[in-house]
Amino acid sequence: MSSSLEQLKATGTTVVSDSGDFVSIGKYKPQDATTNPSLILAASKKAEYAKLIDVAIDYAKQKGGSIDQQVDDALDRLLVEFGKEILKIIPGKVSTEVDARYSFDTEASVNKALHLIELYGEQGISKDRILIKIAATWEGIKAAEILQRDHGINTNLTLMFSLVQAIGAAEAGAYLISPFVGRILDWFKASTKKEYSKEEDPGVQSVKTIFNYYKKYGYNTIVMGASFRNTGEITELAGCDYLTISPNLLEDLLNSNEPVPKKLDASQAASLDIEKKSYINDEALFRFDFNEDQMAVEKLREGISKFAADAVTLKSILKEKLA
């Protein structure tokens, strides 16, 4: 019998590796890979990645400028070095994240994205292998709209916890979205003090709702479930366009022979009764409807704050080496 991982791929789901630790991902044969500041920070503390930091430091020193400018340059180059190494292992695309401190600044997000794409270009990597990852705030959704429409740069809207964000992202023409699963479960468990079966899992339900909405209304934006706490959440989403999975859960799926039947089916979405909404030209309605979802508001705030904090930690490591 084939492994649960192979069965998951057979349902039509594209498997993506969620890790900066590129040494460990090859054996799972993922199509794409995702990174974020937290994953890069974790990987950068490992000895085998020291040479990537050295490259970034040398680059920043050569460019010169103030110490803060050098730190920014080193961080950008480090993100690109990780992306470059990951792209040697996978056939598809890598997601590289814009600093979360720009989550409420459309112009700064666009400029940072253009700069990252330029840095990749200097390494001989074309923009069609990169997804620029931006938090799914109103400003982030607008940045994605500009990048997709005016620059042909593909985006991954992340920290997505609600259908409101997903609708805005689809209308913006985002290439891909990352609705989070495990972090939604965390919130509900803390809030209700209940345990949830994989079928009841509110994070799983959130992704199913978004998937069905997109398929019913014919959006081409890829739905990539993210942030998993266990393999049950993953197998409940078999058939989702993409799933991005950490190496430890990929290992569990590889070592399991549990059956993985298809659970999400685009062809069944057409008959579902789902109300169509529009947000892309109505910031006030987007903000109000999003604000009505306490879980999504709290988790987006927390996610931006954590990614920003990990970027600050990464910068402090780089600053020490630049001194």
Swiss-Prot record:
GO cellular component, one term: cytoplasm
Annotated keywords: Allergen, Pentose shunt, Schiff base, Transferase
Protein's UniProt keywords contain Transferase: yes
Catalytic activity: D-sedoheptulose 7-phosphate + D-glyceraldehyde 3-phosphate = D-erythrose 4-phosphate + beta-D-fructose 6-phosphate
Enzyme class: transferase
Molecular function via GO: transaldolase activity
Active site: 133 (schiff-base intermediate with substrate)
The keyword rRNA-binding is assigned to this record: no
Pathways per UniProt: Carbohydrate degradation; pentose phosphate pathway; D-glyceraldehyde 3-phosphate and beta-D-fructose 6-phosphate from D-ribose 5-phosphate and D-xylulose 5-phosphate (non-oxidative stage): step 2/3
Any Pfam family the entry gives: TAL_FSA
Single Gene Ontology BP annotation: D-xylose catabolic process to ethanol
Xref: CDD domains: Transaldolase_TalAB
This enzyme's EC code(s): 2.2.1.2
SUPFAM superfamilies in the record: Aldolase
Assembly and binders: Monomer.
Function description: Important for the balance of metabolites in the pentose-phosphate pathway. Involved in xylose fermentation to ethanol.
Xref: PANTHER family: TRANSALDOLASE
Homology family: Belongs to the transaldolase family. Type 1 subfamily.
NCBIfam families referenced in this protein's UniProt entry, alphabetically: talAB (TIGR00874)
Protein name: Transaldolase
Organism of this sequence: Gibberella intermedia
Species lineage: Eukaryota, Fungi, Dikarya, Ascomycota, Pezizomycotina
